[in-house]
Amino acid sequence: MRKLADYGRDDHPAEDPERAQLAWTVALLDDCDECDGLRVELTVEEVGSPGAGLVAHLAPATARRLRAALARALREMGEAEDG
């Protein structure tokens, strides 16, 4: 089973010749035979190149660590936390 949680694109201009615009998806995954239990699947790939990206299978603790890192970066740039 793979259940999509959210998807989107980064906010970098598509016309920048030095940096590719990226797409991301976050999903819940339970069919990773090598993984022990449920995983949060994070996929990052260049816009227009579906299937050619990088996929991370994050255990709950690792997903929480990533969430905390994103929250810390937002705080450092002066953004209020949601919720």
Task: Cite the ranges covered by each PLM segment.
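Positively charged, low-complexity terminal tracts
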Residues: 1-83
